[in-house]
Amino acid sequence: MARLSFNLSDRLVILAISAISTFWPLPLSVRLRFGRKYFKCIPPAVVQVSAHRIIKGPCYPCELEALLYVRKYTKVPVPKVYRTYPASEGRIYIEMELVDGVNLAELWLRTGLTDDAQTAIMADLHDAVAQLRSLPPPTEGDIVASASTKEGLTDGRIGPETYGPFASHDAFHEFLRGGIPIETTQKTYGDAVFQAHSKHYKTYFTHADLVPRNIIIKNGRIAAIVDWGFSGWYPEYWEYTKIHFDAFARPDWYKGVKEAIPRYDAELAAERTLWQQFDEPGVARYYYRNSQT
């Protein structure tokens, strides 16, 4: 992140407020106003409140769950959480570490990356995904759920509201199809969706938004992976397909992804069909109901 410059009076205010808030937590509203005035906002929901801290929110508890879970059980670099604040409708604000570095999207588009730099970053990405996939699922079933399995999930691919958890991949896939039974899926969506949703998959912990803007780079390596709001337990292909649910227009990024993490090209074809024909299945509009149930 670019270093900000301040005049003397602003620096004194920042030092005073930062010192006070370290030992005596100020109201959230005060800290957010202070951050917006003296630091910066990082759209859509992040405010920098000191030289080394940000507050993100309102967000769903599943994001906090994921940050704490991944930090505890892996060595994947994630921001440290300091405290939370309650918000309306069951949401929270999370005060966390501001990781020093530049997001990969900005770095790639602004300066480009040499082949050696890309190789180093992709090696780190491979290691991070491998660590997430090594985590044992909380149950033996093929669930789709948050880190703790207790909270609802969120995902821009699905819609603005929480959804799930699901007791099986079949139930999740039916949800993605808008309730269309697997028996009529081929007629409704075509062979790619039918074939993908007829397979059995392992369950892996998944970031589910592992795109360049959420990867912080420092000294040529991954310093942190941020924005864990979409993460949870998903079918094994979800990480790969969700990386492609993004508008980052650099073919060399996607080429590197194909070499860094397990590929699921058939599932990506199925997902692209659903993105076109039935996007945001979590939005309440229409949903197939079997008259026999």
Features from the language model and the residues they span:
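ATP-binding pocket architecture of kinase catalytic cores
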Residues: 36-159
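Short, glycine/acidic-enriched loop or turn micro-motifs at the edges of active sites
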Residues: 100, 212, 230
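An alpha-helical support segment within catalytic cores of ATP-dependent transferases
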Residues: 86, 118, 125, 131-208
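Active-site Asp-x-Gly
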Residues: 169, 200, 204-205, 218-270
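Domain-wide signal for the mature, well-folded portions of proteins, strongly enriched
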Residues: 58, 208-211, 227
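Juxta-kinase regulatory segment immediately upstream of eukaryotic protein kinase catalytic domains
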Residues: 1-36
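ATP/Mg2+ or Mg2+-diphosphate-binding catalytic cores
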Residues: 279-293
